[in-house]
């Protein structure tokens, strides 16, 4: 199969179950809302080493937010519900509560359960906090130096999908990078997903475990390293490929992740120099979802 002349390998991305929460961060301006959203999703590339996977989902205009202010939805994920509950409290408390003019609301539809993030945060008010309501949502109003911080009492959690992915293989590192940036920009049009790595792009793709060091949970994916293609017998890097980047996608459900993979691949295939699109799978060691590339089209 080819898309815009680019080979799409007959393979699949291996994704896995994860618990997700979706939060709407609003502020007095779009700029301030994005700053708060960025801070809240920091250090969230991979649960291999980070306490959560996190990223910005989409911009929400004032007409569609509870407080009629600009906002961004963010997605925060962890395989453990208990750890995700902890991360919500830490991230909302340390990065949104502290951000100028910011507020936080639940933005997850069809939640399987709710956690008391806002209720726990109210105690920062030291007895001066109040209960309130914004567009039918129960909130806690916490007095702060600059005015008030408003946070919804409960945040939803549900089962989502993490690890949707594809590899962009190109003639040069530059063309691979441009294609990766185009893919990430296209994925931003899909609600309910995020790309957790820096700029949405993975430079150092990994494999499960290690061939040499038993203390590692993950190590470099040597089969996809362009500098090793002439050094190892089982290299999967084509002769005419000298640049590879990976895009990883987490989302609220399988269909959203698959939609994001499709639009990302289509965007990448428009860039001159892109030779092939592949995906990462690990023999079932990672997760139960098999997102076949050909099925996306």
UniProtKB/Swiss-Prot annotation:
Pathway info: One-carbon metabolism; methanogenesis from CO(2); 5,10-methenyl-5,6,7,8-tetrahydromethanopterin from CO(2): step 2/3
Tagged with keyword Transferase: yes
Location in the cell reads: Cytoplasm
The UniProt entry's GO CC annotations, sorted and at most eight, read: cytoplasm
Q: What is its main location?
A: cytoplasm
Q: What do we know about how this protein assembles, alone or with others? A: Homotetramer.
Instruction: From the Swiss-Prot or TrEMBL record, give the protein name.
Output: Formylmethanofuran--tetrahydromethanopterin formyltransferase
Designated gene of the protein = ftr
